[in-house]
Amino acid sequence: MKKHIDPRHKRRQAAVKQLFAHSFTKQKATDASTRTILKKQSTINKLIGDAAPLWPINQINRIDLSILQLAVYELLSEKEPVKVIIDEAVELAKEFGSEASPAFVNGVLGKIVEEKEIKK
């Protein structure tokens, strides 16, 4: 039986795919939120790097980094509840990442929320 996929989840999947592709080809993003993420990439990557000091940005798996970039952008925009953003990011990590990706993504986002005192 096929499950209905939430349109917001589909948009997040598309954004992660665009960010991932951009990490290889620097192609232009077609989605407005993805373009905004790319414009704010240095700020977003600094937050990720600070939350994962043992993992320099250039050593983080590119799909995990793409998922984290999307989630951090969403956390900073505060349009969705923190729990929803983290849950969605973990689901994307299960879909696209390695076996260790969900735990890594969850840990990094949890630390960012804690350090930036983002409202839960």
Task: Go through each PLM region and give its residues.
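N-terminal interaction/assembly modules
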Residues: 1-95, 99-102, 107-120
